[in-house]
Amino acid sequence: MNRIDIEGYTPDEILDLPDEQLDALALSGEPLVFRAGTAEILAEFKVRGESLIVELAQIDGGGEGVLPTLTSLIHRYATRRGLKRVEWIVHALNCAEPNLKLRRVMERRGFQITDVEGVGKAYYQVHEIGFF
C-alpha cells in the first residue's frame, strides 16, 4: 500500500505530536475538514467516556487506501489514550451524490445501517480496542 499523508504528515508524525497539540487539533468539538491522500474529508472526533467517536460526514476523492490508513491511525491514537473502543459513524446514506464505492466498502467491512441517536441513519460500527 502507498504511504498516505494526512495534511502533509505521516500517521507516525501525527502520533508523535504532543497529546495537548493533537487533542487541540482533532478534538475541538467542531467539524474538521482535512486532506488525506487525494481525499478531502469532513469529520468530527470526540471522546465520550471510554469511546472515541469518529463521525465521517463526507469523503470526496480517495480510493488509494485512505480509510485503512485512517482506521489504523485512529485505533493507534485510541490505544495510546487508553480508550476502550472506537465508534464509527459514517454518513454515506443521504448524500446528494452518493459514493457507491464507499457504500460497498462500508458493507464489506461489516458496518450496519443503524439509527444512531442524535444523528439519524448512518453506517455504524464499534471496534473494541484490541479486538479489531
Q: Predicted regions span which residues?
A:
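Non-catalytic substrate-recognition and accessory regions of acyl/acetyltransferase enzymes
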Residues: 1-68, 72, 76-132
